[in-house]
Amino acid sequence: MTEIIEDVRDKSASKIDLVRKLLAKAESTDSTAERDALNERASQLVAAYGIDEAMLASQDESLDKITDVSVLLERPFAVDFRGLLGNIAQALHLKVVVSKRWNRDQNNGYGGWDVTARLFGYESDIRRVQLLYPHLRNQVLAGLANVDGEAEYGPGQAANKRAYIAGFAGAIYLRLNRAEKDAKAAEKAREDALRDQTLLARVSDDHGAE
């Protein structure tokens, strides 16, 4: 059993390393099509990692405990980025509680809100969110620099940027949710095929013994 766990852990580590590389490349590209393709592949690998961790936890619950962690959402657009973090967390089966605290030291003494999101769920799912969110946030920040619109400054420009963040967050949720469903379906198909093979082997053995 220990050897099996170590083997799965090694494969999971390889998946996570590749996800980091894909997301880093997605941050650096100016091509929307390439970025989307890289994010799509990263989502698939993150989903596969989740399946690996669930399989390990089914053998030993201590390998993936329920816990919580707090994430301070950085400015600018901290309130809007809670939507991105929340969508990632929801797609990866976490519960999120968001709180705000007035910080008078922000904005050169004018004050501002500190926004904190508290994530609840399995450790492996929290790790997946912690892996994805910083990279995807960086992608959004890079995209905001290219947001077009009639408003060049002021409230109108801020509204355009908030709309961009919301659209990006929505697309990420759909991509991750689809990857999760596809990974679970593939794992179920694999388990069904293995069960059928085992049953067929037993039937063959029974016939051979007659």
Residue ranges and their predicted role:
Residues 1-40:
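Short, charged, low-complexity amphipathic alpha-helix
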